[in-house]
From Swiss-Prot:
Family: Belongs to the D-glutamate cyclase family.
Protein name stated in the entry: Putative hydro-lyase RALTA_B1245
Species: Cupriavidus taiwanensis (strain DSM 17343 / BCRC 17206 / CCUG 44338 / CIP 107171 / LMG 19424 / R1) (Ralstonia taiwanensis (strain LMG 19424))
MF (Gene Ontology): lyase activity
NCBIfam families cross-referenced by the UniProt entry: PRK05463.1 (NF003969)
Gene3D superfamilies the record matches: PSTPO5379-like, PSTPO5379-like domain
Transmembrane segments: none
Keywords noted in UniProt: Lyase
């Protein structure tokens, strides 16, 4: 029996469709940071039809955290605008399933859970702008260490929509001062994948008390000559929806994105 592959860009296909096939076959279950470089990655939220409008409105009001790039018709598991044969039931390395907002369980496929009233949302991910940062020689420590990006809940309020409200989640990348300035200039060009940072510097100012203990992802060390740079994160919907307690909600596991065929340069 084939064993799942470990995260290593050199061992995994660069073609996003080939990578999705590997994921669909259960051969890769890890995070997707640094994989299929140059292609858009997406956070995933799946809700029942009766919650879909509230979430659509939430995305419109909180575009920094939830830049919507595609949505499916009710009951249709295929994203028609993200590439060829993109099946949301099988093409994410790891899913989280929440019921009534309670503790999640993780699974590598949701075909057996799929319902005719499910609507799937694809939300832009900061992994997509990492290629532009690397091309500009901005070092990304989490990729160099083979880790998931660090993500934190903050004290920053999102704008409420219907039954949905809550705090912003951010991703953090340690950068030297000059690189932080360059990264801000570069990521501002990518509003469909979170755009420019929401905060630079002291994490306590946005409600993060212990930067060494992320709420999601992996801890990434901060050297003395580095400052933390924070971007709005597509894990925000998971925190918000969990508080709203819908009957069922399915998301990607943090860091385990849907890799699309879309070119980052078209964003």
């Amino acid at each position: 029996m084939n064993q799942p592959l470990q995260h290593a860009a050199s061992l995994l296909p660069e073609d996003p469709a080939a990578l999705r096939q590997l994921i669909r076959a259960g051969r890769y279950r890890g995070h997707t940071s640094g994989l299929a470089r140059g292609h858009v990655q997406a956070n995933i939220v799946i809700l029942t039809r009766d919650w879909a409008y509230d979430f659509l409105q939430f995305c419109a009001l909180n575009r920094k955290a939830c830049p919507l790039i595609d949505v499916t018709d009710p009951g249709d598991p295929v994203f028609r605008n993200l590439g060829r044969d993109v099946d949301i039931r099988t093409d994410v390395p790891m899913y989280r399933v929440y019921r009534d907002g309670n503790a999640y369980h993780e699974t590598t496929g949701i075909t057996e859970l799929w319902r005719d009233d499910f609507v799937a949302f694809a939300i832009g991910c900061s992994f997509s702008f990492e290629q532009a940062l690397l091309a500009a020689n901005v070092p990304l420590k989490h990729i160099n260490l083979g880790r998931n990006v660090a993500m934190y809940r903050t004290a920053i309020e999102t704008r409420p929509a219907g039954r949905l409200s809550g705090k912003l989640v951010v991703s953090m990348r340690p950068l030297k001062a000059a690189d932080a300035i360059l990264a801000t200039e570069i990521t501002a060009r990518y509003p469909d994948v979170h755009g420019a940072p929401v905060h630079i510097g002291d994490p306590r100012l946005i409600g993060i008390e212990d930067i060494e203990s992320p709420d999601y992802g992996d801890a990434v060390p901060l050297d003395a000559d580095e400052i933390p740079v924070f971007w709005a994160c597509g894990v925000t919907p998971q925190a918000v929806i969990r508080e709203a307690r819908p009957e069922i909600c399915i998301t990607h596991a943090p860091g385990c994105m849907l890799v699309t065929d879309l070119d980052n340069n078209r964003l």
